[in-house]
C-alpha cells in the first residue's frame, strides 16, 4: 500500500518532458509544472516553429513572465528522494503487505510476487509458483525487448506528430495563396462579381476549416499517443532500474498493455482530391450579366390562366402550377399532359418573365401562339412542340436532358421526289454547365426573337429563337409535364 502511494506521488512530481523528478520546478498559469531547463528549451522550440509559447501538455498559450517557481513541489521532490533512499522503505517492499512474510515466490497465474502464506491460501491454491530468482531473468529480457520496441515507437510517433504539424502549416500556406488568387481574379469586376467571390471564398474557408479541424484533432491524437507511450516507457524504466520486486509486481499486465500498443497514423489529405478553383470567364460573365440586366428592364406582370383542372393545379395567387394525377385514372397508362397559358396577350413590344423550376425532373416553357383547348400533347413524342405549330419552347426531360424544339426537318421522298415529307421535331440538345433553377424568357415581338436565360448562372444565354413569325397574339406557356413539383412565376423583387 505504501509503495503504491509512493508511486502515485512520484507520478505527480515527474516532469512531463524529461520524465524525471522535477528539478527547479516552474509552474504555468494552466497548472502544469516542468523542470526549469525543460520548459526553457521548449520555449525556444515553440517560438521557432509556431511563433508563440504554449504549454506542451494542454497547448494553452502564456507569457514568459508568468512562469513561477514552485517551492512546494520542490520540497515534495526532496522528501520523496529521502523516502525512496530509505532502507526501511525497501524493507517494506520486500515483505508481504498481508502476512508480513518475505516475498520469495512468483505466481504465474496472477503475475504477482507472493509469500509462502499467500501460496497456501485459497486465493492461490493450485496456481503455479516459482522462486523469484528463476523468473526474474526471463522477464528482464522481455521487458528489455519491450523497452527497445517502445523507444522505437516513440521515435515513430514523434515523427508522425512532426509530419502532421508540417502538413498543417503547408495547408495554411496553400489555402492562403488560394484566397489571394481568388480575390485577384475578382478585383476588376468587384461590383458585378461580389456574389461569386463571396461564394468561392466561403467554400474555400469551409474547406480550410474542415481540413485544419481534422488536422488539429489528428495532432491532438498524436500528442496523446506519444504521451501514453512515454508513460509506459517510464514504467518500464522504473521497473528495470528498481528492485526485483518492483520488476515483477504486475509484470504480466504491463506486458499485455505493451503488446496492445499500436501506433495510429494520422489522416492525411491529398492535393489531388482537393476542389480546385477555376477562374470564371470574367468577360463572358460581364457580357451575360449586362444582357440579363438589359432585358430585365422589360419585366412583365404575368399570371396563369386555369385550364384542364383534372391534370394541372394552379395556386390561389395564379403564379404557380403543378401536375396532378387525374382523379379518374384510365386503365391504360396516361401518356398525355396539358400546359397552361400566361395571362399576358402579346401583340407588340418587349416582354420578360422568369420561372422557378427548382428540383423538377421535367418541364417545358416558352411562348405559345395558338391554343387548342382539346389538344393533348404526347409526353413521349412532342410532335406539336414546333414553331410552325406556334410553340417556341425549351424543356427538361428525364431529369438531365435539356432541349430546344425546332421545326421538323423536311426531306424528299426517295420514291417520289416531288413529295416533301417531314420527320419529327428537331430536338436541339442544350448543354448546361450549371443547371438552371430559374429560367428567364425574353420576347422581342418586333425583332421576332425569343431568348432564354439561365438566371442561376449569371444570365448566360441558354437558347434563342430567331426569325419567328408572329401573325397573331402570343402568350407565355408553361407545362409542368408529369412531374408533380411546381413551376413558379417569379417577381422582380425575388
From Swiss-Prot:
<dbReference type="GO" id="GO:0043410">
    <property type="term" value="P:positive regulation of MAPK cascade"/>
</dbReference>
<keyword id="KW-0863">Zinc-finger</keyword>
<dbReference type="InterPro" id="IPR000315">
    <property type="entry name" value="Znf_B-box"/>
</dbReference>
<keyword id="KW-0051">Antiviral defense</keyword>
<keyword id="KW-0833">Ubl conjugation pathway</keyword>
<dbReference type="GO" id="GO:0051607">
    <property type="term" value="P:defense response to virus"/>
</dbReference>
<dbReference type="GO" id="GO:0038187">
    <property type="term" value="F:pattern recognition receptor activity"/>
</dbReference>
<dbReference type="GO" id="GO:0005634">
    <property type="term" value="C:nucleus"/>
</dbReference>
<keyword id="KW-0539">Nucleus</keyword>
<comment type="subunit">
    <text>Can form homodimers and homotrimers. In addition to lower-order dimerization, also exhibits a higher-order multimerization and both low- and high-order multimerizations are essential for its restriction activity. Interacts with BTBD1 and BTBD2. Interacts with PSMC4, PSMC5, PSMD7 and HSPA8/HSC70. Interacts (via B30.2/SPRY domain) with HSPA1A/B. Interacts with PSMC2, MAP3K7/TAK1, TAB2 and TAB3. Interacts with SQSTM1. Interacts with TRIM6 and TRIM34. Interacts with ULK1 (phosphorylated form), GABARAP, GABARAPL1, GABARAPL2, MAP1LC3A, MAP1LC3C and BECN1.</text>
</comment>
<feature type="binding site">
    <location>
        <position position="99"/>
    </location>
    <ligand>
        <name>Zn(2+)</name>
    </ligand>
</feature>
<dbReference type="GO" id="GO:0045087">
    <property type="term" value="P:innate immune response"/>
</dbReference>
<feature type="zinc finger region" description="RING-type">
    <location>
        <begin position="15"/>
        <end position="59"/>
    </location>
</feature>
<dbReference type="Pfam" id="PF13445">
    <property type="entry name" value="zf-RING_UBOX"/>
</dbReference>
<feature type="domain" description="B30.2/SPRY">
    <location>
        <begin position="280"/>
        <end position="494"/>
    </location>
</feature>
<dbReference type="InterPro" id="IPR017907">
    <property type="entry name" value="Znf_RING_CS"/>
</dbReference>
<keyword id="KW-0963">Cytoplasm</keyword>
<dbReference type="GO" id="GO:0070534">
    <property type="term" value="P:protein K63-linked ubiquitination"/>
</dbReference>
<feature type="zinc finger region" description="B box-type">
    <location>
        <begin position="91"/>
        <end position="132"/>
    </location>
</feature>
<dbReference type="GO" id="GO:0043123">
    <property type="term" value="P:positive regulation of canonical NF-kappaB signal transduction"/>
</dbReference>
<dbReference type="Pfam" id="PF00622">
    <property type="entry name" value="SPRY"/>
</dbReference>
<feature type="binding site">
    <location>
        <position position="118"/>
    </location>
    <ligand>
        <name>Zn(2+)</name>
    </ligand>
</feature>
<dbReference type="InterPro" id="IPR050143">
    <property type="entry name" value="TRIM/RBCC"/>
</dbReference>
<dbReference type="InterPro" id="IPR013083">
    <property type="entry name" value="Znf_RING/FYVE/PHD"/>
</dbReference>
<dbReference type="InterPro" id="IPR001870">
    <property type="entry name" value="B30.2/SPRY"/>
</dbReference>
<keyword id="KW-0597">Phosphoprotein</keyword>
<keyword id="KW-0862">Zinc</keyword>
<keyword id="KW-0007">Acetylation</keyword>
<keyword id="KW-0832">Ubl conjugation</keyword>
<feature type="region of interest" description="Required for interaction with GABARAP and for autophagy">
    <location>
        <begin position="186"/>
        <end position="199"/>
    </location>
</feature>
<dbReference type="GO" id="GO:0008270">
    <property type="term" value="F:zinc ion binding"/>
</dbReference>
<dbReference type="InterPro" id="IPR003879">
    <property type="entry name" value="Butyrophylin_SPRY"/>
</dbReference>
<feature type="modified residue" description="N-acetylalanine">
    <location>
        <position position="2"/>
    </location>
</feature>
<comment type="similarity">
    <text>Belongs to the TRIM/RBCC family.</text>
</comment>
<comment type="function">
    <text>Capsid-specific restriction factor that prevents infection from non-host-adapted retroviruses. Blocks viral replication early in the life cycle, after viral entry but before reverse transcription. In addition to acting as a capsid-specific restriction factor, also acts as a pattern recognition receptor that activates innate immune signaling in response to the retroviral capsid lattice.</text>
</comment>
<feature type="modified residue" description="Phosphoserine">
    <location>
        <position position="86"/>
    </location>
</feature>
<keyword id="KW-0391">Immunity</keyword>
<dbReference type="GO" id="GO:0004842">
    <property type="term" value="F:ubiquitin-protein transferase activity"/>
</dbReference>
<keyword id="KW-0072">Autophagy</keyword>
<dbReference type="Pfam" id="PF00643">
    <property type="entry name" value="zf-B_box"/>
</dbReference>
<dbReference type="GO" id="GO:0031664">
    <property type="term" value="P:regulation of lipopolysaccharide-mediated signaling pathway"/>
</dbReference>
<dbReference type="GO" id="GO:0002218">
    <property type="term" value="P:activation of innate immune response"/>
</dbReference>
Amino acid at each position: 500500500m505504501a509503495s503504491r502511494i509512493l508511486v502515485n506521488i512520484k507520478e505527480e512530481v515527474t516532469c512531463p518532458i524529461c520524465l524525471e523528478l522535477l528539478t527547479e520546478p516552474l509552474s504555468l498559469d494552466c497548472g502544469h509544472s516542468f523542470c526549469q531547463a525543460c520548459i526553457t528549451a521548449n520555449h525556444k522550440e515553440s517560438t521557432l516553429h509556431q511563433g508563440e509559447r504554449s504549454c506542451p501538455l494542454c497547448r494553452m498559450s502564456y507569457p514568459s513572465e508568468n512562469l513561477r517557481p514552485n517551492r512546494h513541489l520542490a520540497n515534495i521532490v526532496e522528501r520523496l528522494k529521502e523516502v525512496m533512499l530509505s532502507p526501511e522503505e525497501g524493507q517494506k517492499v520486500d515483505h508481504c503487505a498481508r502476512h508480513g512474510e518475505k516475498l520469495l515466490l512468483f505466481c504465474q497465474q496472477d503475475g504477482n510476487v507472493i509469500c509462502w502464506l499467500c501460496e497456501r491460501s485459497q486465493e492461490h491454491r493450485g496456481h503455479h509458483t516459482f522462486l523469484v530468482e528463476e523468473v526474474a531473468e526471463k522477464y528482464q529480457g522481455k521487458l528489455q525487448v519491450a523497452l527497445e520496441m517502445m523507444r522505437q515507437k516513440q521515435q515513430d510517433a514523434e515523427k508522425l506528430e512532426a509530419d502532421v504539424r508540417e502538413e498543417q502549416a503547408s495547408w495554411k500556406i496553400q489555402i492562403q495563396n488560394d484566397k489571394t488568387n481568388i480575390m485577384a481574379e475578382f478585383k476588376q469586376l468587384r461590383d458585378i462579381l461580389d456574389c461569386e467571390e463571396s461564394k468561392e471564398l466561403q467554400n474555400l474557408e469551409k474547406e480550410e476549416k474542415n481540413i485544419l479541424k481534422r488536422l488539429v484533432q489528428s495532432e491532438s491524437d498524436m500528442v496523446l499517443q506519444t504521451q501514453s507511450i512515454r508513460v509506459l516507457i517510464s514504467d518500464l524504466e522504473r521497473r528495470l532500474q528498481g528492485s526485483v520486486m518492483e520488476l515483477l509486481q504486475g509484470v504480466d499486465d504491463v506486458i499485455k498493455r505493451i503488446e496492445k500498443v499500436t501506433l495510429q497514423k494520422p489522416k492525411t489529405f491529398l492535393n489531388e482530391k482537393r476542389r480546385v478553383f477555376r477562374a470564371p470567364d470574367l468577360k463572358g460573365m460581364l457580357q451575360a450579366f449586362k444582357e440579363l440586366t438589359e432585358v430585365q428592364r422589360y419585366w412583365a406582370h404575368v399570371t396563369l390562366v386555369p385550364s384542364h383542372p383534372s391534370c394541372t393545379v394552379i395556386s390561389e395567387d395564379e403564379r404557380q402550377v403543378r401536375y396532378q394525377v387525374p382523379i379518374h385514372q384510365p386503365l391504360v397508362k396516361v401518356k398525355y399532359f396539358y400546359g397552361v397559358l400566361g395571362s399576358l396577350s402579346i401583340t407588340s413590344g418587349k416582354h420578360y418573365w422568369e420561372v422557378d423550376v427548382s428540383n423538377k425532373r421535367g418541364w417545358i416553357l416558352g411562348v405559345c401562339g395558338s391554343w387548342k383547348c382539346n389538344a393533348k400533347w404526347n409526353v413521349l413524342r412532342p410532335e406539336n412542340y414546333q414553331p410552325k405549330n406556334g410553340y417556341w419552347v425549351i424543356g427538361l426531360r428525364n431529369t438531365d436532358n435539356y432541349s430546344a424544339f425546332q421545326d421538323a426537318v423536311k426531306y424528299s421522298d426517295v420514291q417520289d421526289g416531288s413529295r416533301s415529307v417531314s420527320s419529327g421535331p428537331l430536338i436541339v440538345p442544350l448543354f448546361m454547365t450549371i443547371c438552371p433553377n430559374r429560367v428567364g424568357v425574353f420576347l422581342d415581338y418586333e425583332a421576332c426573337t425569343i431568348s432564354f436565360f439561365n438566371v442561376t448562372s449569371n444570365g448566360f444565354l441558354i437558347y434563342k429563337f430567331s426569325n419567328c413569325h408572329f401573325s397573331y397574339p402570343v402568350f407565355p406557356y408553361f407545362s409542368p409535364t408529369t412531374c408533380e413539383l411546381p413551376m413558379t412565376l417569379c417577381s422582380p423583387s425575388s
